[in-house]
Design a protein with these regions (language model features):
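C-terminal helix-cap and adjacent tail motif
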Residues: 3-13, 18-21, 88, 154-166
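Alpha-helix/helix-capping structural signal
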Residues: 11, 55, 135-138
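An N-terminal domain-cap segment
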Residues: 13-37
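Glycine/small-residue-rich phosphate/adenosyl-binding loop
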Residues: 26, 42-112
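Small-aliphatic-rich amphipathic alpha-helix that forms the alpha element of a beta-alpha
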Residues: 30, 34-35, 80, 95, ...
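Short secondary-structure junction motifs
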Residues: 43-46, 124-127, 153
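A glycine-rich helix N-cap at a beta->alpha junction
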Residues: 69-80, 145-166
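Short secondary-structure boundary segments
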Residues: 84, 134, 160
Length: 166
């Protein structure tokens, strides 16, 4: 598929087909594509936590997302939670001090580049995605046992669209 077509095809999906599953291999393909994005000094501090079983997805939705996003990702057969290790990207290794005023902003920047690669690869594979930033960080951290050394940024629902997005 032409790159321009992928860019134009990608849409936020809020209506997933619950009858179509996404394989572990497809999720691994998305994460591999994400990891090819540029990052500060190639430090690759982004982390991906995947919720793939239907019962765990339902439990995660109920415990970690507000009602609006519970509805928005209903039927999605995969959730990918994206984080990055704080205090590394944009920081001097020797002193631990930020190299400029952006500080951990560079970690957000790198993860944003990687998340875009992930969702564009999903579009190429005819998968739909929805990036959700409204979520309960402490509930996610507890549910997935994410260490305090990582900043939780987004939850990405992945699945097949139930209808063609407009």
């Amino acid at each position: 598929m032409e790159f321009q077509t992928v860019i134009e095809k990608r849409r936020s999906i809020r209506n997933f087909d619950p009858g179509k599953k996404v394989s572990r291999e497809q999720i691994e393909t998305l994460i591999r594509a994400a990891s090819l994005a540029p990052s500060w000094k190639n430090l690759q501090t982004s982390r991906y936590y995947c919720v793939l079983s239907p019962s765990r997805i339902e439990e995660f939705r109920q415990k970690c997302l507000p009602e609006s996003n519970q509805k928005n990702c209903a039927g999605a057969p995969a959730l990918i939670i994206t984080t990055f290790k704080k205090g590394i990207v944009g920081f001097d290794k020797a002193t631990g001090s930020p190299v400029n005023e952006a500080g951990d902003g560079w970690g957000y920047y790198d993860l944003g580049l990687q998340n875009e690669n992930l969702i564009l690869k999903a579009a190429e594979l005819d998968l739909g995605t929805l990036i959700m930033g409204i979520r309960d960080e402490s509930a996610i951290r507890e549910y997935l046992k994410i260490p305090e050394t990582e900043i939780i940024v987004a939850v990405i629902a992945v699945g097949y669209p139930a209808a063609e997005p407009s």
